[in-house]
């Protein structure tokens, strides 16, 4: 049987409603919810459209086989472009980069980037801030694995091989001083 995205490609003559009923019955939902799911034209169209679509590659990709319903078990690919910030003052850019370094959502990356921003951001030139801004637009786990030089998990792209900012981040991430890592305070007080 031919497959697309790991799902069987079924002839259109097979009843979509039958497959949807089989899936919904397995969920153990209330009768009213089950009735809605089985009789909703939106659900039928969603099922028909999502079942056979392939994926496209994008520069920045969030990919996850995220759903337990078989007809939704496919890769979800979203292309997220960073916001263009024209005429951003140097001070505003520094503050934004501090915020973006601290509020990533993954503890390991938060710790490394917040310490890096505290140590190096106040003395960065505009060009270095642009490079750091580009680095922050990468995925969190990619940044983390590049910072700790674990290229087996996430290979380092050519774009970052000669990066001075990434080299500084890697040097700081090595933690040769044996310092216990914690999120630095925003102000200068201890």
Curated annotation (Swiss-Prot):
Signal peptide: none annotated. Pfam families: Sdh5 (PF03937). GO terms for biological process: mitochondrial electron transport, succinate to ubiquinone; mitochondrial respiratory chain complex II assembly; protein-FAD linkage; tricarboxylic acid cycle. It is found in: Mitochondrion matrix. Keywords: Chaperone, Mitochondrion. Gene3D superfamilies: Flavinator of succinate dehydrogenase (1.10.150.250). It comes from the Eukaryota. One of its GO terms (cellular component) is mitochondrial matrix. Belongs to the SDHAF2 family. This protein may be expected to contain an N-terminal transit peptide but none has been predicted. Plays an essential role in the assembly of succinate dehydrogenase (SDH), an enzyme complex (also referred to as respiratory complex II) that is a component of both the tricarboxylic acid (TCA) cycle and the mitochondrial electron transport chain, and which couples the oxidation of succinate to fumarate with the reduction of ubiquinone (coenzyme Q) to ubiquinol. Required for flavinylation (covalent attachment of FAD) of the flavoprotein subunit of the SDH catalytic dimer. Interacts with the flavoprotein subunit within the SDH catalytic dimer. This is Succinate dehydrogenase assembly factor 2, mitochondrial. It comes from Komagataella phaffii (strain GS115 / ATCC 20864) (Yeast).
């Amino acid at each position: 049987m031919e497959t697309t995205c790991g799902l069987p490609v079924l002839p259109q003559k097979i009843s979509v409603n039958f497959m949807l009923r089989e899936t919904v019955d397995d969920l153990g939902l209330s009768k009213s919810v089950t009735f809605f799911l089985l009789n909703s034209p939106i659900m039928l169209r969603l099922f028909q459209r999502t079942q056979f679509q392939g994926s496209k590659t994008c520069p920045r990709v969030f990919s996850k086989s995220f759903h337990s319903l078989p007809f939704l078990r496919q890769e979800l690919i979203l292309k997220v472009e960073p916001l263009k910030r024209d005429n951003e003052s140097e001070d505003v850019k520094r503050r934004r980069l501090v915020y973006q370094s601290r509020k990533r959502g993954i503890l390991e990356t938060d710790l490394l980037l917040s310490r890096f921003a505290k140590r190096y951001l106040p003395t960065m030139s505009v060009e270095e801030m642009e490079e750091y801004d580009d680095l922050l637009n990468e995925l969190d786990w990619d940044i983390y694995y590049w910072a700790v030089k674990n290229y087996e998990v996430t290979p380092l792209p050519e774009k970052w091989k000669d990066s001075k900012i990434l080299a500084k981040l890697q040097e700081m991430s090595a933690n040769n001083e044996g310092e216990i890592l914690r999120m630095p305070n925003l102000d200068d007080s201890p």
